[in-house]
Amino acid sequence: MSILCGVPILECVYCLGCARWLWQKCLYTAGHESENWGLATAEEFEPVPRLCRLILSVYEDDLRYPLWAPPGGYGINPDWVIVKRTYEETGGCATPYMIYLDHDNVDIVLAIRGLNLAKESDYAVLLDNKLGQTKFDGGYVHNGLLKAAKWIFDAECELLRDLVEMNPDYRLTFAGHSLGAGIVSLIAMYAVQNRDKLGTIERKRIRCFAMAPARCVSLNLAVRYADVINSIVLQDDFLPRTTTALEDVYKSIFCLPCLLCLMCVKDTCTLEEKKLKDPRRLYAPGRLYHIVERKPFR
């Protein structure tokens, strides 16, 4: 009798948990997350639009005859492109990228494109991670993204060192979007740890702009590298809020409804304090800038 009486109660609790999870994930406006943050200055945010255009240019096959240029173009000089690597050249170890010597803005930029939905190698990089699998500088990082970051750094560190030494007043900037944002964040951290390989460049000359990055570093590393890495999140962008442990979702695609139910119950019943205390949990890297452009239902 007690079991039968308990069934409706359990169902109600379950439904309330699912409703709360749905509210948080789908209806709760992201503007509330940053409503108490300070406003960014124009000087802080100035590089972002320019670097976004530069990242977009990596998608082009021929920068002299672009096919998908935004209004006003990419704002770059094709003659200042030092190298531009394709999937064939990276061998699937990383997404395509470009090194650009920006004389107008006194900047050496390594820009990496985002996830290519048609490339299996990109998924392999993103899904190559387990909770607490890889340690770095006293914290935890995403295993697949770190391997891609090390591959690019090792491949281009001599070229970057030459550019830094030939242009001692230029900053070294890493910029990327989505999957590429996670990779450049870890490249920046790896570069800070190996500045001797870049001609002993000062830490203050290294910076990173990660547009909609994947969660790739533990909380202590996100804070420690906040002076180097800047993460830009647009409105309700899901990637910086979504765990990178997606292997189970892809492996269980045929029982996705059951998996989502388990996820919402676990998310509802786990205290935020407990999540924050887990040193292995990954977060968006560095200092966060949140762009809020609209309100819900408006």
Residue ranges and their predicted role:
Residues 1-175, 179-298:
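Non-catalytic, mobile gating and regulatory segments of ester bond hydrolases
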